[in-house]
Amino acid sequence: MKRVFLVTFLVLVSTFLLGATKEIVFWHSYSTTSGEYELLTKDIIPTFEKSHPGIKVTEVQVPSDEMRRRLIVSTAAAQYPDVMRMDIIWVPQFADIGVLMPVDKEFAQDFAKLKGTFLPGPLSTNYWKGNYYGLPLDTNTRVLLWNKKLFQAAGLKQPPTTMDEFIKDIKLLTKDTNKDGQIDQWGFADNGFGPWNTIPWIYSFGGKILDDTNSKALGYVNSAQSVEALKTFKDLYQQGYMAPIGGGGIGTLEGYAEGVYAMIFEGPWAWSIIKGQYPDAEINFALVPAGKGGSKSVVGGEDIVLFKSTKYKAEAWEFAKYMTSKEVQLKFAGIGQMPVLKGLLNEPVIKNHPFFGIYLQQLETAVARSPHPAWNEINDIMDSAWQNSVVGGIDPKKALDDAAAQIEKVLKNYK
């Protein structure tokens, strides 16, 4: 009789505990063949569930090229995951339509404690109209890659640290090495005219795209500093000191590795791509040269967001916090994902890494691509303005005046 009672009791307890478990669904785009996916599914989630026995995390992998379509379908059906790893550009877009949870409002005390632990650039990508709609999860930026052999051949010992030195070195390192009358070595190369490429120029020169509230372009995108950045870039390009962009030539990473380009701006993925094709290539990193605005670069990456529709907001928040914890951030750093927390430069996994240190240092001052729901439109306007000036010959001030007017029209829809 006692045995029957005990078995019945255990069944009831198990049923109760099973019923009490709260399932949260986490969308992400980590490739199922990646180290990040293996870490997430075999370590991060199981460890979280073990320390939070009442929570079950169901991860759903959505390929990155399908994610936006899935989100749009979810919007139409009003069916969202609880938590998502979201591209930083999308956060203000989905915050603006009211589907994301303002975490600084819902979890005010927790957020106040966490806010100061994040790198400012990645954190800013979650901000829209007075609230934060997520936490930074992983990040990246662009730094200067310089070819030491080409520098030494030109009598230069160190990479440039200022914009003046940068411009001087670009000119010095552009050469016709085989004396056939054609330039075959360029001081600098890049692969586009959009803000991802040009923000290091604009902001290091002291310019901006939008004001601090992301509601005004006039006087910022066409400020004297922004115009100077475009004019400098245009002059270098038209005078032949920068490699042609979009002309079907050698790619920036290949050109850097092969000694065709002395300097490029590139992200942390450059290491694996270059080493994969050129195992013996020497790669040297430095901060973006500082101008009147300091050493500034652009922020990339993903945030972790909660949807308002979640039934388990407290549990979803616990998982989001866990994903941004020092423990988890360092685990991901160990397989190549850039962390978002301050104060990690002396951690062994960072200190002993060939390039994380310089990227984290750059991220201390890196700026987001103006967090705004209409960023894609703003991006295209800026891309066209720079391209029309650099390649098309339009005066830099006119190009940016026109861009400012176009962006102002876009911004009016969000005031």
Predicted feature residues:
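Conserved N-terminal structural module of periplasmic/extracytoplasmic solute-binding proteins
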Residues: 18-99, 108-115, 158, 245-246, ...
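Hinge/lid segment of periplasmic solute-binding proteins
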Residues: 63, 88-143, 167, 183-184, ...
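Paired acidic/hydrophobic, glycine-rich loop segments that form the ligand-binding mouth/hinge
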Residues: 82-85, 262-266
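Short, solvent-exposed loop/beta-turn-alpha elements that line the ligand-binding surface or hinge
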Residues: 104-118, 178-188, 207-228, 276-277, ...
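Glycine-centered hinge/linker elements that transmit conformational signals in sensory
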Residues: 169-174, 215-245, 288
